[in-house]
């Protein structure tokens, strides 16, 4: 029997230290709900998890971006509806003025209303704003006559670079629709049946222009609706994948924690027994 080195006690102490460390890790995981709390727990798993988290947060923001885009489109469409109603009324008055039974004085009264309605078209265009940005004055329109863009509304609908799309909204002022002269800014004149007749054709083109823009906005909105649904599914699936990597299985971890607690208790008891074994040497010295 030797007394300088108690191998049983040394083994028990080393094993007990390892088990205590395991218990500490069990407690960390159970309290945080995470299998990976630091890089030392799983270096590669942490790297993959953080990359996934970046994508998940990007997708969640992209979904919000797309929903904001839908709101932008809905606001623009609402203003265009008002413009349509005004143009329809001007056309109705033009059809009325084109009838020969009205006198010059009658047409003058009609012209007064037409002038006010044309001014309303410009008011709508100048007041149609989203987050302080004018929507119907050409800010987001294609440049006339060329296949280039003066500006556009970009919607970033992905988690990564260049995953975006843009929408165009044409100029919807009275000048752009031909019901106000671009030079002297005079209003469409319907003081004779001939002028009123020509005005009907101009107004038909204006209505066609608005209808085309509203159809484009409807297509943009439908696309963004599908985009939001797709992004949400992608984010959900990626979140599930990230959870499998990073989150702890609580039931399994609790079983492991219970096992390690028992080992700590038994290890402590055995360390005491190992230390006590050397005390028997004293009986030889008596």
Curated annotation (Swiss-Prot):
UniProt subcellular location: Periplasmic flagellum; Periplasm
One Gene Ontology cellular component: periplasmic flagellum
Keyword Lipoprotein: no
Alphabetically ordered keywords of this record: Bacterial flagellum, Periplasm
Disulfide bonds, paired cysteine numbers: none
InterPro entries, alphabetized: Flagellin (IPR001492), Flagellin_C (IPR046358), Flagellin_C_sub2 (IPR042187), Flagellin_N (IPR001029)
Domain of life: Bacteria
Entry GO MF terms: structural molecule activity
Entry's family note: Belongs to the bacterial flagellin family.
Physiological role: Component of the core of the flagella.
PANTHER family tied to this protein: FLAGELLIN (PTHR42792:SF2)
Record note on quaternary structure: The flagellum consists of an outer layer composed of repeating units of FlaA around a core that contains several antigenically related polypeptides. Interacts with FliW; a synthetic peptide of FlaB1 (residues 229-247) partially blocks binding of this protein to FliW.
Protein's UniProt name: Flagellin FlaB2
Lineage of source species: Bacteria, Pseudomonadati, Spirochaetota, Spirochaetia, Spirochaetales
Gene: flaB2
């Amino acid at each position: 029997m030797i007394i300088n080195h108690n191998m049983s006690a040394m083994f028990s102490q080393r094993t007990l230290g390892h088990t205590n460390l395991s218990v500490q890790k069990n407690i960390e995981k159970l309290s945080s709900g995470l299998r990976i709390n630091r890089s030392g727990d799983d270096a590669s798993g942490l790297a993959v998890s953080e990359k996934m988290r970046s994508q998940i947060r990007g997708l969640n923001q992209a979904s919000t971006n797309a929903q904001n885009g839908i709101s932008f489109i809905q606001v623009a469409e609402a203003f265009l509806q008002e413009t349509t109603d005004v143009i329809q009324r001007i056309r109705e008055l033009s059809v009325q003025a084109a009838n020969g039974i009205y006198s010059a004085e009658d047409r003058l009264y009609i012209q007064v209303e037409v002038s006010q309605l044309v001014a309303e078209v410009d008011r709508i265009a100048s007041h149609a704003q989203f987050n302080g940005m004018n929507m119907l004055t050409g800010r987001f329109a294609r440049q006339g006559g060329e296949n280039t863009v003066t500006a556009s509304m970009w919607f970033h609908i992905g988690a990564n670079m260049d995953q975006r799309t843009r929408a165009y909204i044409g100029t919807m002022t009275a000048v752009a629709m031909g019901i106000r002269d671009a030079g002297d800014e005079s209003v469409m004149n319907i003081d004779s049946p001939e002028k009123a007749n020509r005005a009907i054709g101009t107004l038909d083109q204006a209505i066609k222009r608005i209808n085309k823009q509203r159809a484009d906005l409807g297509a943009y909105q439908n696309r963004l609706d599908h985009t939001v649904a797709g992004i949400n599914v992608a984010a959900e699936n990626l979140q599930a994948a990230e959870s499998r990597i990073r989150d702890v299985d609580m039931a399994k971890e609790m079983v492991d924690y219970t096992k390690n607690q028992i080992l700590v208790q038994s290890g402590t008891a055995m360390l005491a027994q190992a230390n006590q074994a050397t005390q028997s040497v004293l009986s030889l010295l008596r």
